[in-house]
From Swiss-Prot:
The gene is kmo. This is Kynurenine 3-monooxygenase. The keyword NADP applies. Belongs to the aromatic-ring hydroxylase family. KMO subfamily. The keyword Flavoprotein applies. Pathway: Cofactor biosynthesis; NAD(+) biosynthesis; quinolinate from L-kynurenine: step 1/3. Its EC number is 1.14.13.9. It catalyses: L-kynurenine + NADPH + O2 + H(+) = 3-hydroxy-L-kynurenine + NADP(+) + H2O. Catalyzes the hydroxylation of L-kynurenine (L-Kyn) to form 3-hydroxy-L-kynurenine (L-3OHKyn). Required for synthesis of quinolinic acid. It comes from the Bacteria. One of its GO terms (biological process) is anthranilate metabolic process. Its cofactor is FAD. Pfam families: FAD_binding_3. It comes from Flavobacterium psychrophilum (strain ATCC 49511 / DSM 21280 / CIP 103535 / JIP02/86). One of its GO terms (molecular function) is FAD binding.
Length: 447
């Protein structure tokens, strides 16, 4: 156990709450601040994308000893359900029957705060942090940005306050601090499929449902109460955009024409559409993530990504796993802990940002593409015969804890092989053959 420190975490979201549990485990005094009210006392906002928990997330929760306390609020999704026209195609996720798990962000956040409080962390809600003194880890808080501030000193401060982090904003004022943000021209809006009157599900419960339509798409993830949380991803401007759907008639006509099998299962479509906000999607990168042994960024505050690999929360939780490994290795040397944490984690954060953006293209356009579906079939077939030679990219990202940067590099190599295979004459009918098997092995050995 480390020497006890007085530590502040800014941000009571998923990453901040789990970090609090890990730090309490090491005997530290932990205070968690958030400018928002306690989420346990308020209604959900209608702008949340359901979470897809996978191996990296469970690994971090289990490391804190709380995984089993979360599993009962998660629903296993073993496959994608692809809705194209009136057809429904299923794509199973893992080679060995692995699943990802749907969890409501609000339900999980409430649970994580409860668990952090049980571990001994103290939470302070509706506390606005305006600045932090980097050299002595002093938080400056007050009612307004230009009003009177109160200073509260700590041994160290963690910024877990999201993509638009106040703590990172302070670090950006340093020399040699690199920062970039990139918004997609696509936004998102939450919609809702209620349960049947008897509480049963209107769609297959154990699937992540996708309606791929090129520049826009709809996804739906199951909730415990029989409902689904849907997210419509769509350009802000242009044809088939949020701007073009500006009245009830246009929304209803658009869904009837383009997403006809959703009309009967989303009874409050127009109400949801105009009541719920249209939100932005941003990739944010920065470096360094730490200042001496005093301040560190973690989760979205260090690396916000778009949600198309279902890895935002998983990556944030894995930050904590890596930080905790450094704590075990370097004891009370927080300067080295912080330095090794950011050095180890930055390449993987960049890799999952790239993979998430690419998966947006895959989910919205390629899942309806016959050549792409054939490629996935060939990969699965070969991987099932040679699991030691070929782990598909999705499985490397989702069902392992190997570095994201490794998954990206190997995935790129596998993609070059598959593009060669798809050029072979009559591949559509001759892919399950020894000839193709040997060709893939030959290409693998050419590296």
């Amino acid at each position: 156990m480390q020497k006890s420190q007085k530590i502040a975490i800014v941000g009571s979201g998923l990453v901040g709450s789990l970090l609090a549990i890990y730090l309490k485990k090491e005997g530290h005094t932990v205070h968690v601040y958030d400018r928002s009210p306690d989420i346990r006392t308020i209604q959900f906002s209608g702008r949340s994308i359901n979470l897809a928990m996978s191996n990296r997330g469970w690994n971090a929760l289990d490391g804190a000893g709380v995984g089993d306390k979360v599993r009962h609020i998660a629903i296993a999704m073993e496959k994608r359900a692809i809705h194209i026209g009136n057809q429904l195609n299923f794509q199973h996720y893992g080679l060995q029957g692995e699943c990802i798990y749907s969890i409501s962000r609000g339900v999980l956040n409430r649970k994580m705060i409860d668990l952090a409080e049980e571990a001994g962390a103290e939470f302070f809600f509706e506390q606005k942090i305006w600045d932090v003194n980097l050299t002595d880890a002093t938080l400056q808080m007050g009612e307004t940005e230009r009003g009177e501030w109160t200073n509260v000193s700590y041994d160290m401060v963690f910024g877990a306050d999201g993509a638009f982090s106040r703590i990172r904003h302070r670090m950006q004022r340093q020399s040699m601090f690199n920062y970039s943000q990139d918004f997609l021209n696509t936004g998102y809006k939450e919609l809702h499929i209620p349960a049947n009157p008897d509480g049963s599900y209107k769609l297959d419960k154990h699937s992540l449902h996708i309606w791929p339509r090129g520049k826009y798409m709809l996804i739906a993830l199951p909730n415990l109460d029989g409902s689904f949380t849907c997210t419509l991803f769509m350009p802000f401007e242009g044809e088939n955009s949020f701007a073009s759907l500006d009245n009830r008639q246009k929304v209803e006509a658009f869904f009837a024409e383009n997403l006809p099998d959703t009309v009967d299962v989303i009874p409050d479509l127009a109400e949801d559409f105009f009541k719920n906000p249209t939100s932005t999607l941003v990739t944010m990168k920065c470096f360094p993530w730490t200042y001496s042994d005093k301040v560190a960024l973690i989760g979205d505050a260090a690396h916000a990504i778009v949600p198309f690999y279902g890895q935002g929360m998983n990556a944030g939780f894995e930050d904590i796993t890596i930080l905790y490994q450094m704590m075990q290795e370097y004891g009370n040397d927080w300067k080295t802990i912080f330095s090794e944490y950011e050095k180890s984690r930055k390449p993987d954060a960049d890799a999952i940002a790239e993979l998430s953006y690419r998966n947006f293209m895959e989910m919205s356009t390629k899942t309806a593409n016959e050549k792409f579906l054939l490629q996935k079939k060939i990969e699965r077939w070969f991987a099932s015969k040679y699991p030691e030679k070929w782990i598909p990219l999705y499985d490397r990202v989702t069902f392992s804890t190997r570095p994201y940067s490794e998954a990206l590099a190997i995935g790129d190599f596998q993609e070059t092989i598959m593009q060669e295979i798809l050029k072979i004459e009559n591949i559509e009918t001759n892919w399950e053959t020894e000839e193709i098997e040997h060709k893939i092995i030959q290409l693998l050995n050419s590296k």
